[in-house]
Amino acid sequence: MSQPTAGVPELLVGQPDWHAVLVKVLENFQCVTGTIHRTDPSTGLLTLVTQHGIPPQVLPMLLPKIDNIPFGKGIAGCAAQRKEAVQLCNLPEDLGGVAKPDARKTNVQGALAVPIVGADGKVIGVLGIGKMQTYDFNVHEIADLSAVAALISAKI
């Protein structure tokens, strides 16, 4: 893996292009799919800011479900509620019930979501990445993605 934050700070100047930020994060972590959600202060829901790599055949069905996510629902919602990283090394066979049935249709297997925490300690978003093969993210990768989320927290 390249330096996990490589190129990210440069993309966070001014008004960030969140899709470009996400694509750079995916490249750095050798992942093919990901999302950035922001917590909507008026609804308390995680609102989709951008996504990349969700297969086009499932996007129309999945988009309404990932557009606004309650804390505690799905991988991103669980990361937000728990205020800690949530990962699934084999999303289609998630036996813990974290992944929602429609998420399994993406064919993403290894998935990791980390909360984006603001200066006040509140969850202001979630950064999620995924691989198309079964994958168990190690503690260093989890810490690295959390470091990227900390960079994002200053701008989201």
Residue ranges and their predicted role:
Residues 130-148, 156:
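Regulatory loop-to-helix N-cap segments in sensory/regulatory domains
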Residues 26, 35-63:
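GAF sensory/regulatory domain recognition
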Residues 59-84:
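Acidic/proline- and glycine-rich, intrinsically disordered low-complexity segments
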Residues 1-16:
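Signal-transmission linkers at sensory-effector interfaces
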Residues 56-61, 89-110, 131:
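Signal-transducing coupling segments at domain and membrane junctions
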Residues 109-118:
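A short, aliphatic-rich beta-strand micro-motif
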Residues 42, 117-123, 132:
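Flexible loop/coil segments at beta-strand boundaries within sensory signal-transduction domains
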